[in-house]
UniProtKB/Swiss-Prot annotation:
It is a single-pass type II membrane protein. This is O-fucosyltransferase 30. The chain crosses the membrane at residues 26-46. The keyword Disulfide bond does not apply.
Length: 507
């Protein structure tokens, strides 16, 4: 005892004495630690086994978590309408094909389509459906939302309806639509003047409201009762059909092979599901004000479709025919026809040569071979000078050493025409599109006079879209000597569609 209270005196046996005094404390602390660790382990095991919905927004009141879901907004501000939102990706041609699919889905499900902006080329990438390597629907939705807000902040927002003419669709009541900017203003409670200017500072209340809206519409926090239903099925699991007479839920013919399953550790099984039975009348999704898809891209693949197989359904034949070809707005078509008549001034061949991007850069020779064969055939039929309009991603200063370089030197037999990035008429066409502001003319929810004024003053297009590409496609639609496109290019498919519907003569 004296040793314990008198530290100045050395203790011959300090450790045994110390242990006697601390045994009870050590046992107590050890017991508490074990209990804490035990409860932590139990919590995480329990958490991992609980249904995700318990920790998602759907487990709570949407109006508490998201003010945008208050009943007065859904019933009064949005007039009780049901909306469809989706997440486009990649270049313009892919975005256009998704837009057409979105129009069909909106028509089938009787929802108002939220018209998206035209995204920067490859600003949002989906991935590869055939390889079962894609972004999840919630990931691509939040990417598209963020990029859309970035376009607004940087004054580069152009609506799909500013470029593509949907006036006949809307006037015939085939579909209902609303501009993304106006919808975001109503849903998120952000004034149009603030939304459409570069004053959208990241620390502002408006920016925070939009950020919260993004979380809501992306579905990253789950569904919200009567407000949002986020579709999580994508091309890895689902092929959407519509009243085609087949059994709902049957296996699709295209499935991942065993090698891919093993390599990617896949357990996905692709099933064909009727979109109306799954998301239409009488379903959980029907009650939600907003139905949010991910990507709506599809393409034929190995005897099936990657994601959407509704285009041959007899029930929507009329709508499919109306959506099949959506022409450019008149300003673009006039510019293309004017270039053909006033600059080329002769019958011409159009060559669309995609040489730099993605897989196409590895197939230059085969791309050039198609053009060579077409020109050889034309030379036999039409001896003399052949005019060729070239639309390509290969800059002119890189033509040396390529077939294009050889053609440009052969001025006796060929005359090449192309649109330069600095051509004056591009800026003129952009200005005309800005003035027209076609995207503001459509909306299922009437605008107040104040909103109309703000849209016209602050939300007009700002030339951020690739007007050159659209005009080049319009020029190619007028090529009387034919068209040579790059195999596998969606741009080539778009030009072929324009030529099929005689866009040049009918515009």
């Amino acid at each position: 005892m004296n040793n314990f209270f008198n530290p100045s005196r050395p203790s011959p046996r300090p450790w045994p004495n110390r242990k006697k005094q601390t045994d009870k404390s050590a046992i107590f602390l050890c017991s508490v630690s074990i209990l804490v660790v035990f409860f932590i382990v139990v919590f995480f095991i329990t958490y991992s086994e609980m249904p995700k919905s318990l920790f998602s927004i759907s487990a709570f009141s949407g109006s508490v978590q998201f003010p945008q879901c208050r009943s007065e907004i859904l019933t009064r501000t949005l007039l009780g309408q049901k909306f469809l939102w989706y997440a486009p990706h990649s270049g313009f041609s892919n975005q256009l094909s998704e837009f057409k699919n979105a129009l069909l889905m909106a028509g089938i499900l009787n929802r108002t389509l939220i018209i998206p902006p035209i995204l920067d080329h490859h600003a949002v990438a989906l991935g590869s459906c055939p390889k079962f390597r894609v972004l999840s629907p919630s990931e691509i939705r939040i990417s598209v939302w963020n990029h859309s807000i970035e376009l607004l902040k940087t004054d580069r927002y152009v609506s799909m309806a500013d470029i593509v003419d949907i006036s006949s669709l809307v006037s015939s009541s085939a579909v209902r639509v609303i501009d993304f900017r106006y919808f975001a203003s109503l849903q998120c409670g952000v004034d149009l003047e603030t939304l459409c200017t570069d004053d959208l500072a990241e620390q502002s209340q408006a920016y925070e409201s939009l950020k919260q809206c993004g979380y809501l519409l992306s579905g990253v926090r789950g569904n919200v009762d009567k407000c949002l239903y986020a579709v999580d099925e994508d091309c890895r699991t689902t092929v959407w059909t519509y009243k085609n007479g087949e059994a709902d839920g049957r296996l699709d013919s295209f499935q991942p092979d065993e090698k891919l399953k093993k390599k990617k550790k896949l357990s996905n099984v692709r099933r064909r599901r009727d979109v109306y039975k799954t998301l239409g009348h009488g379903t959980e999704a029907e009650s939600a004000a907003i139905l949010a898809f991910g990507s709506l891209f599809t393409a034929p693949y190995k005897g099936s479709e990657l994601y959407i197989d509704i285009h041959k359904s007899p029930k929507i034949k009329s709508l499919v025919e109306k959506v099949d070809f959506l022409p450019f707005v008149r300003e673009i078509m006039i510019a293309g026809k004017k270039f053909a008549s006033e600059t080329i001034k002769a019958p011409f061949l159009c060559a669309q040569l995609r040489l730099l991007d993605g897989q196409f850069k590895n197939h230059r020779e085969s791309t050039f071979t198609g053009l060579y064969q077409k020109l050889e055939a034309l030379s036999v039929k039409n001896p003399g000078l052949i005019n060729v309009f070239v639309m390509t991603d290969l800059p002119e200063f890189n033509w040396t050493g390529t077939y294009l370089g050889d053609l440009s030197k052969n001025s006796t037999n060929f005359k090449l025409h192309f649109i330069g990035e600095q051509d004056e008429f591009l800026a003129r066409t952009e200005h005309e599109l800005d003035s027209a502001s076609h995207g503001q003319k459509f909306g299922s929810i009437p605008m107040s006079l104040d909103s109309i004024k703000k849209m016209q003053t602050h939300c007009y297009p700002h030339g951020g879209s690739n007007v050159q590409l659209y005009i080049e496609e319009a020029v190619c639609s007028c090529a009387s000597l034919g068209f040579v496109g790059t195999p596998g290019s969606t741009i080539a498919d778009s030009v072929e569609m324009m030529r099929k519907y005689n866009a040049c003569s009918s515009s």
